[in-house]
Amino acid sequence: MAMKCVAFVFTQGPHGNAAGREGLDALLATSALSENLGVFFLSDGVLQLLPQQQPEKILARNYIATFGVLPLYDVENFYICEDSLQQRGLSEVTDWILDVEVLSPVNLRRQLANYDVVLTF
């Protein structure tokens, strides 16, 4: 049986709720079972990748750095939505905590269509 391609889509900002942390936990767990993973950041999910966050100031757990170790788990396909960046004034940011490929919404949808399962957080 062929392994399914699984996409993880992060649509919510960090620290306001547990969605980002739960998605990252699910991604790490799935990485042990599959090599066909893609990680997408759109809408407020692009905020997950901003460097130099200080969640401890709002008494939140700092899980963001864990995104940076995903390549060690052979997770290597990372995509971020160009429009989402522009809408949040982040189009000039280049020091993301992951090496992401910036895609237009059309190309992001095309890339996402290559996956059998899409999990949204």
Curated annotation (Swiss-Prot):
Pfam families: DsrE. This is Protein TusC. One of its GO terms (cellular component) is cytoplasm. Signal peptide: none annotated. Gene3D superfamilies: DsrEFH-like. Heterohexamer, formed by a dimer of trimers. The hexameric TusBCD complex contains 2 copies each of TusB, TusC and TusD. The TusBCD complex interacts with TusE. PANTHER family: PROTEIN TUSC. One of its GO terms (biological process) is tRNA processing. NCBIfam families: PRK00211.1, sulf_tusC_dsrF. Part of a sulfur-relay system required for 2-thiolation of 5-methylaminomethyl-2-thiouridine (mnm(5)s(2)U) at tRNA wobble positions. The lineage of its organism: Bacteria, Pseudomonadati, Pseudomonadota, Gammaproteobacteria, Enterobacterales. It is found in: Cytoplasm. InterPro entries: DsrEFH-like (IPR027396), Sulphur_relay_DsrE/F-like (IPR003787), Sulphur_relay_TusC (IPR037450), Sulphur_relay_TusC/DsrF (IPR017462). Keywords: Cytoplasm, tRNA processing. Its main location: cytoplasm. Belongs to the DsrF/TusC family.
